[in-house]
Amino acid sequence: MRRLPPAAGSSRQSLLPLSNPGLTMKKEDVLKQYTTPTGAPAFVPGPHRFTSREYLNITYRTDREALAKLVPEPLEIDEPLVRFEVMNMPDTTGYGSYVECGQAAVVRHKEEVGEYIIGMYLDNLPAIAAGRELSAFPKKLGSARLFVDSDTLVGTLDYGSLRVAAATMGYKHKPLDFEKARAEICVPTFMLKILPGYEKRPRICELVRTEISNITIKGAWRGPARLQLFEHVLAPLADLPVREIVAATHILTDLTLSPAVVIYDYLTDSAPQSSSKEK
């Protein structure tokens, strides 16, 4: 009977301690790694190009007191406005295809108006890991969809088996000026970067800023919309209730995300001297 060779990693020799220290990964090679596992990284480094990235955006008015609990200083709130978004990303270098949903508050940092990202939900591990590690996107696991149902653009978000958001918009009712669409997508974005240390205190606690600059608008529309948010303790979008729909847009783009820069360090209670805005 023919004998099969031992499976990879199953030989007795592989279980013995290494006799030659030179066979281990050198320290300088460890420093070349950008994430783990080192043999099969959770994501590939950028830049990541998003082709045919499609947005359903609904801006709505909410309760100021509820929003103030979620927006960190030194950011300020002029009006209690929130943008609910569902993004279909069918062709992304390194990440593949996925759909994402989130909420962003309209805020101001000094004289600059932008958005503070409250939370993002998606079901693509590389995009979750890279968003949290390489940048500061507050991503967690969820299942979003963006699709056309007859004459309606529909966006949904499920957390586990439960529906937590449902958005509908009239499909391509009125054209939206491309420059207005560009301004909406390229608004400065602020996020919290928090990395805990081993002794419970944070090792990193920063407010960062990013801004999309490399973008092509391929289509843009506006129209009527409705948004329903459902209570969930671990996906608390409904903590910012919908009081009034302000605007709704449907935008198709190609774009590349810019790296984030630190604008405030909570551990030193200061803005880094070397910080500069990414343009």
Name each model feature, range by range.
Residues 2-3, 12:
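Basic polycationic patches enriched in arginine
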Residues 12-24:
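Short, Lys/Arg-enriched N-terminal segments with co-localized hydrophobic residues
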Residues 129:
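Phosphate/adenylate-binding glycine loop and adjacent helical scaffold
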